[in-house]
Amino acid sequence: MSITKNDKNTRTTGRPTLNEVARRAGVSPITASRALRGVASVAEELAQKVRDAARELGYVANPAARALASAQSHSVAVLVPSLANLLFIETLEAIHAVLRPQGLEVLIGNFHYSRNEEEDLIRNYLAYQPRGLLLTGFERTESARRMIEASGIPCVYMMDLDSGSGLNCVGFSQLRAGEAAAEHLLARGRRRLAYIGAQLDQRTLLRGEGFRRALQKAGCYDPGLEILTPRPSSVALGGELFVQLLASQPQVDGVFFCNDDLAQGALLEALRRGVKVPEQIAVLGFNDLPGSDCTVPRLSSIRTPREAIGRRAAEQLLALIAGKEVRDSALDMGFELMAREST
């Protein structure tokens, strides 16, 4: 087979082209492109023919070429603070399930709870002109805020609420969730209540503030019953901090952890040391992560709508990309207190 540079429908290198895939599948290059991107308007039978042709030829899409051809990428950038936490994995799965059928690639950035790292990721992603941004919370550097605003790219904020800002956001009130935690423990007759928080991102601090306010209102707040550490949340850390709390405050009768993994660690340590839960001390977690209903005793926790937040945030972003008006810019997904055996 002879190959010439003047024939744009043949390749000039050994790399298969989209045009070759289209010819083999018997469709136009545009249809082939849409099929490979998973656009829902392409019939499944036709899309399968295109995928088969691409596989037979060893074709791999070139995102840079696609972006140059359309003057805009087909991607959405999603930034989360951690991929080690199931909280964000469930949210990302929901986002992908909404965006992928629309032919949008999901670019995931993990900024490890670092504002500077998030700023770098935002700068890098904006250079590729994504169709939209999905960001976690409102806490970031001023430089990052300016870049987002100047880009003009649709953006939706997840996990937190700020109805007064006019920003598009999907989440729940972290402050109110903290208050609900305190109210639950108070209703169980507990008065010596502790709060243990790790990582110390804005959401953790807001939960603690809500917890503190409710205790102050009840007249039983003790600042000596707060343990806060910037260390990453984990089961092992939960056990360690629980032991620290019992050693320094033996009269404590209830504790609220900022995340379930910490609370799960506390339950394991209580079992190891013969501390009776909830008879001696009530233990309450947050997020209701998988496994919390299988601990001994079963962990009480505040369930957060992680899947729903991801899904609705992605849907809101699609509406913004399409130029539609979003009436409820601040969408409160609420939370649910799961009262189990540990309280």
Curated annotation (Swiss-Prot):
Domain HTH lacI-type: 16-70
One Pfam entry name: Peripla_BP_3
InterPro entries referenced in this protein's UniProt entry, alphabetically: HTH_LacI (IPR000843), LacI/GalR-like_sensor (IPR046335), Lambda_DNA-bd_dom_sf (IPR010982), Peripla_BP_I (IPR028082)
Coiled coil ranges: none
Molecular function GO terms recorded: DNA-binding transcription factor activity; transcription cis-regulatory region binding
Keywords: DNA-binding, Repressor, Transcription, Transcription regulation
GO biological process: regulation of DNA-templated transcription; regulation of glucose metabolic process
Induction and repression of expression: Negatively autoregulated.
Chloroplast as UniProt keyword: no
SUPFAM superfamilies found in the cross-reference section: lambda repressor-like DNA-binding domains, Periplasmic binding protein-like I
DNA-binding region(s), chain positions: 18-37
Control of this protein's activity: Free GntR fails to recognize gluconate and 6-phosphogluconate, whereas the GntR/DNA complexes recognize both ligands. It is therefore likely that GntR DNA binding induces structural changes that permit GntR to recognize effectors.
Function description: Involved in the regulation of glucose metabolism. Represses its own expression as well as that of the gluconate permease GntP. It employs an effector mediated de-repression mechanism: in the absence of ligand, GntR binds to the gntR and gntP promoters and represses their expression. The release of promoter bound GntR is induced by gluconate and 6-phosphogluconate that bind with similar apparent affinities to the GntR/DNA complex. The release of GntR leads to transcription of the genes.
Name of the protein: HTH-type transcriptional regulator GntR
Organism: Pseudomonas aeruginosa (strain ATCC 15692 / DSM 22644 / CIP 104116 / JCM 14847 / LMG 12228 / 1C / PRS 101 / PAO1)
Underlying gene: gntR
